[in-house]
Amino acid sequence: MAKQTRRVLFKISGEALSKDSSNRIDEMRLSRLVSELRAVRNNDIEIALVIGGGNILRGLAEQKELQINRVSADQMGMLATLINGMAVADALKAEDIPCLLTSTLSCPQLADLYTPQKSIEALDQGKILICTTGAGSPYLTTDTGAALRACELNVDVLIKATMHVDGVYDKDPRLFPDAVKYDFVSYKDFLSNQLGVMDASAISLCMDSHIPIRVFSFLQHSLEKALFDPTIGTLVSEDVNHVCSPRH
């Protein structure tokens, strides 16, 4: 039986905002994201959004190229997510879609400091919650930050939109043409087989809180379709029958 969905967290790659490997935020891609968030919200779904910063800067890559320490590199990556979040927030406001921009780092001139209580209030009020700066600590990925937010906000499902693959595979399909895609994989099998796409800490957090994850290609499908169509991407869960349905 389909589970009635009330609250969802979307994890979006920063690359979804840029075009042709550019670090420039693309107007059309930003407009598409806003349009798709509106479509999901029109189903009476509460939305939290965690956005990456890889289109602007990747912490580990910058650490190697610029010879800066890991902590500084990761903090630079966190700030990149804030830049993307500011762009999304302004684009939503321009369309009269209420939102709250939050940061785990204190920067009151730019965003509200993230707290679960304030964030849940915003969701209850119908605002789209934008969570930036990842987990707020170095050495932790934005995927882990998204999983933390999903647990704190008690979401019904975490949807990860990727730009490179259309689900979870037994090995990297970009390197191995014979890679096999999973329609469903349990949390434990994901961890024991060391599958890619999301890091183990993010999977473990969702497993402990019984939050299903759907991984799909943002290049191929919409957020709304990924949320409600069980044939899209890969479901990572303890229950193969977990299907989301709109609220009525």
UniProtKB/Swiss-Prot annotation:
Top EC class per UniProt?
A: transferase
State whether keyword Protein biosynthesis applies. no
Catalytic activity reads: UMP + ATP = UDP + ADP
Inhibition and activation profile: Inhibited by UTP.
The residues listed in the UniProt record as binding UMP, with positions renumbered to this chain, are G53, D74, A135, G136, S137, P138, Y139, L140, T141, T142
Among the entry's GO cellular component annotations, what is one? cytoplasm
GO biological processes:
'de novo' CTP biosynthetic process; UDP biosynthetic process
Pfam families (UniProt xref): AA_kinase (PF00696)
This entry's Enzyme Commission designation comes to 2.7.4.22
**In which residues is ATP bound?**
K11, I12, S13, G14, G54, R58, T162, Y169, D172
UniProt lists the family membership as follows:
Belongs to the UMP kinase family.
* Self-association state and partner proteins as the record states: Homohexamer.
**Role, per record:** Catalyzes the reversible phosphorylation of UMP to UDP.
Name-wise, this protein is: Uridylate kinase
Organism for this UniProt entry: Chlamydia pneumoniae
